[in-house]
């Protein structure tokens, strides 16, 4: 069973660099990505279909999207408060 993803390595590299540049502390950015990946791995443990993308790659993509689109974060925060 081979996992395949349609993630472009150049795009992934660019998004990773954006995350690191936006962070004041490179170590903290890496730890946040690792923690999110770990959380996603355990959340998606039952969903074998969604495991085509590795958790670290998914975490980088999600965090990069949140960085580029801050309204995502505010929408999530508003839904949590309700």
Swiss-Prot record:
Q: Which reaction does it catalyse?
A: RNA(n) + a ribonucleoside 5'-triphosphate = RNA(n+1) + diphosphate
Q: What class of enzyme is it?
A: transferase
What's a GO cellular component annotated to this UniProt protein?
DNA-directed RNA polymerase complex
Q: Which InterPro entries match?
A: DNA-dir_RNA_pol_omega, Pol_omega/Rpo6/RPB6, RPB6/omega-like_sf
Source species? Trichodesmium erythraeum (strain IMS101)
Quote the protein name from its UniProt record.
DNA-directed RNA polymerase subunit omega
State what this protein does.
Promotes RNA polymerase assembly. Latches the N- and C-terminal regions of the beta' subunit thereby facilitating its interaction with the beta and alpha subunits.
Keywords associated with the record: DNA-directed RNA polymerase, Nucleotidyltransferase, Transcription, Transferase
Subunit comment: In cyanobacteria the RNAP catalytic core is composed of 2 alpha, 1 beta, 1 beta', 1 gamma and 1 omega subunit. When a sigma factor is associated with the core the holoenzyme is formed, which can initiate transcription.
User: Could you say which protein family the record assigns here?
Assistant: Belongs to the RNA polymerase subunit omega family.
Name the HAMAP family on file.
RNApol_bact_RpoZ (MF_00366)
